[in-house]
């Protein structure tokens, strides 16, 4: 069992404590989720004598195992769709980058047969004094058939198998995706009413572009690549293709274009 968390130490005192707002890649490593679920056909021996015998396969079933330790996880139907540990964390990428969610806990249970991630939604309230109740979004799944891929709002801070069970039990708003169906993160978010809108995504990209400073040689190199199909770091021809258009675009970018002198546009991407 392995997990990572931010904030208060779990009751069991285990896990890796992380600073707030760490990237998905850090969570993946510290929560013990930096491995994949691989699969192999089921094989069995026939007419075995000692260690020798004919090996046959059973095409209706497959073995799931860990890519890092090669430890077996389960035997499932060949129609079983696995959800990878990284997919559980990636579910939160746009929510944390655009919608203000913050990952709170994540980890693996039962040797990797079950894993989860939990993010704080930013909603919460204080009940009678200092009793703070926070809103979370939980995504949990298994690879042994014991748990469908389940996304649900909860007020339970999941840090172990017991708290995971409590969070999943009795949730009327849970979205469950059985393993005979492919997990579609965006469809689940839409069902929960938390999908990042096109406008939110656009604003997120615009803010990042406005913060990205661009030097003159970078801009010229980009324009030459796109308009002249010439690498600025290579040998330049005597006459640039589309040179007139290149100069026009350069002038627009450097101040003659409408809006190019705005603080969010001048010298940025």
Where do the model's predicted regions map?
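N-terminal low-complexity, intrinsically disordered segments
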Residues: 1-109
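Generic structural hydrophobic/aromatic packing signal, biased to beta-strands
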Residues: 64, 117-119, 139
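Beta-rich nucleic-acid/ligand-interaction surfaces
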Residues: 105-124
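Short, well-ordered loop/turn elements at secondary-structure boundaries
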Residues: 59, 112-113, 133-134
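Intrinsically disordered, low-complexity regions enriched in serine/threonine
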Residues: 1-49, 123-269
